């Protein structure tokens, strides 16, 4: 596999290998056979980051070989969305012709959507001034005239220049509803949009008929909270990153959802608040005791749940856990399986042709 060539003929074999590997990892926990969700075989990534290599007045996208660390020129990137691939050569041609925008540019970050919007962050090893802003504005207008629904953002040390806005608005069809999601550049979003839709629909299907409220830790821009809100009386969600909280609040309003409350705090702090260890000013006006959370949803970072949060999670009758690292999931299951059993297991091929697996488990309290 190279950046410009995907081994599409090996897609089924690599998915079969992952399915077997996940099954073996989950066997000690008496998990059922996984439901397996396929990715598109190409153009599945909505985000891409490239370093920029300068060769005299020329420049091009590069990536580094993970083994040899050699640089590889990338003119097309079939793992990325068709929109990113359409913009890549057009943007580089425009940058080649503009020394102010080209000089000291070292990275381009693309963030695209199924809705047709795209944002590009240009990263520099130099200060950005008014001349840069003027040239960037001209470039943005030129590319918009060519049909790209584009946002350009300039970044340098301690500097961020946003010509118009630093986000794109995504629209995903989820179980019969169009869900609007504001996605902010340089914040976490699900990289594989088609797989994200399948993850949301799986989470909806396994929580159908739920009673009580839902608690979500690490909610990001509200990706899961908002889709799952239809299955619960109320949703209480926590997130620490300010841009993600702001995006989540926008998404609540844009989707006309009235039963979701987002609070800005770390999972560890929330654990302290729930256990009455500490009081937080941020929770004034929120009656934690009034929530009847019978399901907790967690989508933690690769490191998994810390010990305190794992113990907090055990207090809930049902745990819905999305994991981007089955190894740390298994470490957490050593604790969680003492009180809960796995009733549903899913494999989501979020990152085709790589070793990485994303999976979901629904755990229910043992009788």
UniProtKB/Swiss-Prot annotation:
GO terms for cellular component: cytosol. GO terms for biological process: tRNA methylation. Its EC number is 2.1.1.-, 2.1.1.35. InterPro entries: MeTrfase_TrmA_AS (IPR030390), MeTrfase_TrmA_CS (IPR030391), SAM-dependent_MTases_sf (IPR029063), TrmA_MeTrfase (IPR011869), U5_MeTrfase_fam (IPR010280). It catalyses: uridine(54) in tRNA + S-adenosyl-L-methionine = 5-methyluridine(54) in tRNA + S-adenosyl-L-homocysteine + H(+); uridine(341) in tmRNA + S-adenosyl-L-methionine = 5-methyluridine(341) in tmRNA + S-adenosyl-L-homocysteine + H(+). The active site is at residues 324, 358. One of its GO terms (molecular function) is rRNA binding. Keywords: Methyltransferase, S-adenosyl-L-methionine, Transferase, tRNA processing. S-adenosyl-L-methionine binds at residues 190, 218, 223, 239, 299. Pfam families: tRNA_U5-meth_tr. Dual-specificity methyltransferase that catalyzes the formation of 5-methyluridine at position 54 (m5U54) in all tRNAs, and that of position 341 (m5U341) in tmRNA (transfer-mRNA). Belongs to the class I-like SAM-binding methyltransferase superfamily. RNA M5U methyltransferase family. TrmA subfamily. HAMAP family: RNA_methyltr_TrmA. PANTHER family: TRNA/TMRNA (URACIL-C(5))-METHYLTRANSFERASE, TRNA_TMRNA (URACIL-C(5))-METHYLTRANSFERASE. This is tRNA/tmRNA (uracil-C(5))-methyltransferase.
